């Protein structure tokens, strides 16, 4: 999926022997766990923390060199066995073959004409690696006792993958042998390659991903060495950081949600063969047939014999593609950047604005998005900005006015402005805010384009620079679009143009008719971000912006990254760190050198 590099392939069996002390590794992983469990540093300190964590990880990797297990041969040597295994177990394998598409890596190539919407690929449940199959495997005993595994299906799948890879008789070995040995996610970037992402929005999630992965590895290293329920896992003698990085990357780039067998809920799964398909723009064409209990995929478009068969991964931004899938997608029609906005509690009209927003189903503080295509904002962001810029009289009209309900319904519709003055204010604000965000970058669009043309860069460095270039291009488009809208509504106000009238309430009017094909997008709910200082209009216009896009100091981070599952691993890690502090020597004594 996406461009995949491969230096060597992973194999079940024993790795090379290295003279490394288990006690020394436990001490290093305990130190890593403690470091990764510290609170998120303030603005400008994240890079320093990243370097410190990376230094510890590299120490561990150096000690573990030669311990990882490998398969013989190349990845594509195992493709015939994958097809044979899939065929024998009820998957469709006719009409396509696995082929190498150079920059995009391996993918599926049509061997006959395939019509749009034709069912061409299906994979039965028994071929899938799922959280349920993990619970029924050798991992089940530890799963039943570990809160992290129970709460985080992606980590469960990663360990399921590692355990099955270490079993030469695993049912899934024909699939596992064909997985890449390395990925192009930022977990595999060199330090100088990550440097290119500094000052971008994406860097915060890159730091978070690296820190979380290191914390999880350190936590589970101790669990595997000391927990009674982990004694039967085939990982005790060889569980390296590189192994864990490979497993979480395999899951991160491939996991999908499918329904459980009874259809009552969803679970995470790895889908062999289907996950060979690369991405293009389009619509989701994969579903799950509960009656036949299989994953099914219909063709996104007509494919001629010899053409690559693409699928659509979803409406992901390029930041999401780079961080979670390891590739940058040119001409991504769903690309976007985040913009954190909130109504300040010190605003004298806060209570009224909060009530209007609540009636519209919009939080008073959230992460919204600026899009790469016109219009740059969703209906939800338009509604928020209108309320954000309302005066007292306009707020009263939306709360107790004669047509209050109608006005709430049309908040997100571009055809029905609140007033010309309100429209001028909101576009002026958006123009200023996007301009502020542009100032946080150390290079310009022209600088990045020139750098890409004149330097011989690694694939990772190219990806990083394209990502920061893309962020700036979206912000520049937003500035131009907002300026054009501001000028238009200023003229409407100067000309005394009448406001458009509406007749009756219609919930459909909440959608922005200019972008009726796009649902409002909120990238993160209020509960998912830390408590933040919100902005008044005048504060946003005049605020200084720091390197990583902070406005008004450390309490105005617009790209907070914290999820419930991350909090859980951190909570568990803190507990383990305390254990490590209190009984480090006792714990290491349990592992004989």
Curated annotation (Swiss-Prot):
EC number(s) given by UniProt: 2.1.1.85
Domain of life: Eukaryota
InterPro entries: Rubisco_LSMT_subst-bd, Rubisco_LSMT_subst-bd_sf, SET_dom, SET_dom_sf, SETD3, SETD3_SET, SETD3_SETD6_MTase
Region entry Disordered, spans: 1-21, 549-593
Pfam family, one: SET
Domain SET: residue ranges: 94-314
Entry's localization field: Cytoplasm
UniProt KW keywords: Actin-binding, Cytoplasm, Methyltransferase, S-adenosyl-L-methionine, Transferase
GO BP annotations listed: actin modification; peptidyl-histidine methylation; positive regulation of DNA-templated transcription
Stretches with biased composition (Polar residues): 553-562
GO (cellular component) term, any one: cytoplasm
Notes concerning its domains: The SET domain specifically recognizes and binds actin, suggesting that it does not accommodate substrates diverging from actin.
Protein name, entry field: Actin-histidine N-methyltransferase
Gene name as annotated: SETD3
């Amino acid at each position: 999926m996406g461009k995949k590099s491969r230096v060597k392939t992973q194999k079940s069996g024993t790795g090379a022997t290295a003279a490394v002390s288990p006690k020394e590794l436990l001490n290093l992983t305990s130190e890593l766990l403690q470091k990764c469990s510290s609170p998120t540093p303030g603005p400008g300190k994240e890079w320093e923390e990243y370097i410190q964590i990376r230094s510890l990880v590299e120490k561990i990797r150096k000690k573990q060199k030669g311990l990882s297990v490998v398969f013989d041969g190349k990845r594509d040597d195992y493709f015939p066995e994958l097809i044979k295994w899939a065929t024998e177990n009820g998957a469709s394998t006719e009409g396509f073959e696995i082929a190498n598409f150079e920059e995009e890596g391996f993918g599926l190539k049509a061997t006959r004409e395939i019509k749009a919407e034709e069912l061409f690929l299906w994979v039965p449940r028994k071929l899938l690696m799922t959280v349920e199959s993990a619970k029924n495997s050798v991992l089940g005993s530890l799963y039943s006792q570990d809160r992290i595994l129970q709460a985080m299906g992606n980590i469960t799948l990663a360990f399921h993958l590692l355990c099955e890879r270490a079993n030469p008789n695993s049912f899934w070995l024909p699939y596992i042998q064909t997985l890449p040995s390395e990925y192009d996610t930022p977990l595999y970037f060199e330090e100088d390659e990550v440097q290119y992402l500094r000052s971008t929005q994406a860097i915060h999630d890159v730091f978070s991903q690296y820190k979380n992965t290191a914390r999880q590895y350190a936590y589970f290293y101790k669990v595997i060495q000391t927990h009674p329920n982990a004694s039967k896992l085939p990982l005790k003698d060889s569980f390296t950081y590189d192994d864990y990085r490979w497993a979480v990357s395999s899951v991160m780039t491939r996991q999908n949600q499918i329904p459980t067998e009874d259809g009552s809920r969803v679970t995470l799964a790895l889908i062999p063969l289907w996950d060979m398909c690369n991405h293009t723009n389009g619509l989701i064409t994969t579903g799950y047939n509960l009656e036949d209990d299989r994953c099914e995929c219909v063709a996104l478009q007509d494919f001629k014999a010899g053409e690559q068969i693409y699928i659509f991964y979803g409406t992901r931004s390029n930041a999401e593609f780079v961080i979670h899938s390891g590739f940058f997608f040119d001409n991504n029609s769903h690309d976007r950047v985040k913009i954190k906005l909130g109504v300040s509690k010190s605003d004298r009209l806060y209570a009224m604005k909060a009530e209007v927003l609540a009636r519209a189903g919009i939080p008073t503080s959230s992460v919204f998005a600026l899009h790469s295509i016109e219009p740059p904002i969703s209906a939800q962001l338009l509604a928020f900005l209108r309320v954000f810029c309302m005066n007292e009289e306009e707020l009263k009209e939306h709360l107790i006015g004669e047509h209050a309900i109608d006005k709430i319904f049309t908040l997100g519709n571009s055809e029905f402005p609140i007033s010309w003055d309100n429209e001028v204010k909101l576009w002026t604000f958006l123009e200023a805010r996007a301009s502020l965000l542009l100032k946080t970058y150390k290079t310009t669009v022209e600088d990045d384009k020139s750098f890409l043309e004149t330097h011989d860069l690694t694939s990772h460095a190219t990806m990083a620079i394209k990502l920061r270039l893309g962020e700036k291009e979206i912000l520049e488009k937003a500035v131009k679009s907002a300026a054009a809208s501001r000028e238009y509504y200023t003229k409407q106000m100067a000309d005394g143009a009448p406001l458009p009238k509406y007749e009756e309430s219609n919930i459909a009017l909440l959608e922005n008719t200019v972008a009726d094909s796009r649902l409002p997008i909120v990238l993160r709910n209020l509960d998912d971000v830390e408590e933040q200082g919100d902005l008044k209009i005048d504060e946003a216009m005049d605020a200084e912006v720091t390197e990583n896009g902070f406005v008004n100091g450390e309490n105005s981070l617009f790209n907070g990254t914290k999820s419930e599952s991350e909090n859980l691993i951190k909570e568990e890690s803190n507990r383990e760190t305390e254990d490590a502090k209190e009984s480090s020597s006792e714990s290491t004594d349990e592992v004989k050198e």
